[in-house]
């Protein structure tokens, strides 16, 4: 059962913002469709005064569609062009006759300025909790919905910073054959084309907006700007790795012509080579690419994400999610080398099945896949059967992390070992970071300062297969869940850090999850950061095993240094039938595997 107060607060937050209320009416102000209708939107030739029932009488904007509650068999055909209004969809189809939103081939540009805004509280992203976030497409309390386009031909483009698709309390939703991109990426980039003496010449990708003044370069786009510098990476396309460095503070930048710059070093010599790309971003996590919240049965099929801002596809308290044939990579033949600020696919507090198959992930500044729960610290015990808990990480808070009926584990902050369980019977949100939980049974008597709880009802099984992970300076997959995990037949290419990392902590990111059943089988690891597979929970004073029952079998490791597997505080480990090479020569397992 969902927390009704928290859900209402979330809905109200999603309705706040400067967007015109008439374009985004509430459910009670909408008209119920009888079903089996076809409507058309044509931003170039339409008129919102038209009936919208044929291409020749199409609406101009999404506003008339936003005044409907759609029903089984309804189809909304959206023709390409510039969309000034978000699509805010409510309705319910059936499994046999879903509501279909068909984006016709071409460029669908969602303009900056009048899009629907809200204040969703997003895990690992909440640097700006009170700033309205724009949304191009919003699905709310929608069921049996199909979003579709033509693969390789239908592109949804954002002019300014926004969430592409935000869905909350939705069910049976599929996204098929769609491409997603930014007109003006929030990641500043340039490609070095020439180095001579103390000067580099570089080309800035099309669509990347910038100004040069007084020897400095500023990246900008609709509603945002930042001066070059701060967090950055240098990507070497020839090797597919991140290497090198660049400090713009020691340079003078001049514009030679539109998209062409020179960079002269005031001291020292150029630190980049021709063919290398500089990637530069603001570190403020104020938005994400896609947000899926309290929704279930979500399918992504044959989609391509060319660029998204901030954290990537965030699934928060969702159930049963599948990504099939998803590609996250820059547009072919583009000079861009980055597709995502942070994680590609981020799962926080989900349950059911997470399936990722036949995908290409990467081109990000953080992990390809991250699956975790959240540890909340116990800060008070106001009654024998009550506890007050607090979100501890500054980028994760504000959402309803518990509901009546959820099972919780009490976890030692020092050992990370669960020592008691209970069931939630009531939830009271005290403020954006603190929650009072009423429990069915009294608290255990051995709670220690800084101990935490985890919502173990919301823990998913994970199956990742036939997926390529590349062009990432950090990790490939972070996986912490007690339900079964299977990673098989995947290919990891030159991740900067471990290709697969299993942690669990109650002092840093507070990302929770003991592992109870994990198999890593028949994967290929090429020149990844080491240890390539690292299973090391962050237990300050370990006592016993945090994780257990892990099998690593039949994998192939091409090593840079020699450490393929490092495991700590984990029981029932099997590492067998794996192949290890370094510099083309086989090395024995005892040298490549470190289990203690």
UniProtKB/Swiss-Prot annotation:
The keyword Signal applies. Residues 1-21 form the signal peptide. The keyword Secreted does not apply. Its EC number is 3.2.1.n1, 3.2.1.22. InterPro entries: Beta-barrel_GLAA-B_II (IPR056441), Beta_helix (IPR039448), Pectin_lyas_fold (IPR012334), Pectin_lyase_fold/virulence (IPR011050). Keywords: Glycosidase, Hydrolase, Repeat, Signal. It catalyses: Hydrolysis of terminal, non-reducing branched (1->3)-alpha-D-galactosidic residues, producing free D-galactose; Hydrolysis of terminal, non-reducing alpha-D-galactose residues in alpha-D-galactosides, including galactose oligosaccharides, galactomannans and galactolipids. Pfam families: Beta-barrel_GLAA-B_II, Beta_helix. PbH1 repeats lie at residues 351-373, 482-504, 515-537, 547-569. It is an enzyme of class 3 (hydrolase). It comes from the Bacteria. Residues 23-57 are annotated as: Disordered. GO terms for molecular function: alpha-galactosidase activity. Alpha-galactosidase that specifically removes branched alpha-1,3-linked galactose residues present in blood group B antigens. Has no activity toward linear alpha-1,3-linked galactose residues. Belongs to the glycosyl hydrolase 110 family. A subfamily. This is Alpha-1,3-galactosidase A. It comes from Akkermansia muciniphila (strain ATCC BAA-835 / DSM 22959 / JCM 33894 / BCRC 81048 / CCUG 64013 / CIP 107961 / Muc).
